[in-house]
Structures are given as structure tokens and as C-alpha cells.
């Protein structure tokens, strides 16, 4: 008999690819806000998983059909198991997941968002520790949310571009930024 998953395994074995934000129509479709840079995760038929909280064991669903809402980071998905609006509404705020083993390969200089969270941030010029990466925002330009050691109640947003973030060393859990005037204010 298989051992039950530990809390850590429940979280580490999965990648959150989106959040169900609304029901769509009357046939059980849902709207999903993407947390992935890979549209195929929402357009390709196959197995996906959902859970309400990271402490829950993910439940499987079969993606039957998916399409992107033009100009938005939203997808409309239809799952075989969800057949009416009431079932779809019950899934609002659930996380949509794939196994961590399904990570797609990246080009050099590309990173999975989950790998950036928790990295220790250092000043590129003098090596001083500045804080920790606590969030990631996809906007016009990607932004790192950094909680500073000197002011842990404040998050600063730093553009995630090579000119400002020249060094990312995942194995060392290290990220370096070039501090320019006003960047960390």
C-alpha cells in the first residue's frame, strides 16, 4: 500500500498553472486566470488536477476543450466531469495543477516563477544581502516582489530584466540586483 503524501509532498509535487475564477455559461465551463507562460497547458486535452488549498490532495479532471479569451490572460475550459453551471461555480477559487514532472523545458535565461520565489536577493556591486523574493507579477514587464531585510513590512517591485537583475543562480538560491537610485525606496 502506498504511503500517504506528506504536506510537503502535496505542495512540491505540483505546479499551479492557474486559478478558476468564474463559471462560464450553463454547460459547466470555467474561466481560469493563467499563472503559466505555456498556453498548451490550457489548450491540450488531457489530465489536470484541482484543489482548494495546498493542504488538500489534488483531484483529477479531464480537460476536454480549452480556448483563450483574446487579449486577456484568461482561458475558458471544459472538463468532462463538470457538466453544469452549479458544478462549475463550486470550483471558483480552486487551483488548477499539473504534476511537477510535467515542467516544460526552458530556454537559457528563462525561469519558472516558482523557482524564483524564496531566492535571497543580494546587491550585485557589493554583495550585501538585501532581502528575499516573495512574489512575481506579470505586467507589461515582469516584476519581482522583494521583501527587504531592513523593512520586512514593505514589498518593493523590481523589474525582472537583465539590466537590473544580471544574476540568477537557482542552485545557490541567489539573485543579484543592480541597485539604482530610488529602486528600493
Swiss-Prot record:
The keyword Electron transport does not apply. One of its GO terms (biological process) is maturation of SSU-rRNA. Gene3D superfamilies: PRC-barrel domain, RimM. It comes from the Bacteria. Residues 108-183 form the PRC barrel domain. The keyword Metal-binding does not apply. It holds the Pfam family RimM. It is found in: Cytoplasm. InterPro entries: PRC-brl_dom, PRC_barrel-like_sf, RimM, RimM_N, RimM_N_sf, Transl_B-barrel_sf. One of its GO terms (cellular component) is ribosome. Keywords: Chaperone, Cytoplasm, Ribosome biogenesis, rRNA processing. GO terms for molecular function: ribosome binding. An accessory protein needed during the final step in the assembly of 30S ribosomal subunit, possibly for assembly of the head region. Essential for efficient processing of 16S rRNA. May be needed both before and after RbfA during the maturation of 16S rRNA. It has affinity for free ribosomal 30S subunits but not for 70S ribosomes. Belongs to the RimM family. The PRC barrel domain binds ribosomal protein uS19. Binds ribosomal protein uS19. This is Ribosome maturation factor RimM. It comes from Synechocystis sp. (strain ATCC 27184 / PCC 6803 / Kazusa).
Amino acid at each position: 500500500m502506498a504511503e500517504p503524501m506528506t504536506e510537503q509532498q502535496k505542495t512540491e509535487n505540483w505546479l499551479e498553472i492557474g486559478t478558476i475564477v468564474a463559471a462560464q455559461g450553463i454547460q459547466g465551463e470555467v474561466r481560469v486566470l493563467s499563472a503559466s507562460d505555456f498556453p498548451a497547458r490550457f489548450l491540450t486535452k488531457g489530465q489536470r488536477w484541482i484543489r482548494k488549498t495546498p493542504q488538500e490532495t489534488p483531484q483529477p479532471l479531464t480537460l476536454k476543450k480549452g480556448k483563450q479569451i483574446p487579449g486577456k490572460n484568461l482561458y475558458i475550459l471544459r472538463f468532462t466531469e463538470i457538466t453544469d453551471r452549479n458544478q462549475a461555480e463550486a470550483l471558483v477559487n480552486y487551483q488548477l495543477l499539473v504534476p511537477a514532472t510535467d515542467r516544460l523545458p526552458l530556454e537559457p535565461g528563462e525561469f519558472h516563477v516558482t523557482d524564483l520565489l524564496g531566492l535571497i536577493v543580494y546587491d550585485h556591486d557589493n554583495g550585501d544581502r538585501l532581502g528575499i523574493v516573495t512574489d512575481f507579477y506579470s505586467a507589461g514587464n515582469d516584476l519581482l516582489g522583494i521583501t527587504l531585510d531592513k523593512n520586512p513590512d514593505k514589498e518593493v517591485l523590481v523589474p525582472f530584466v537583465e539590466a537590473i537583475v544580471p544574476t540568477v543562480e537557482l542552485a545557490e538560491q541567489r539573485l543579484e540586483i543592480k541597485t539604482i537610485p530610488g529602486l528600493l525606496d
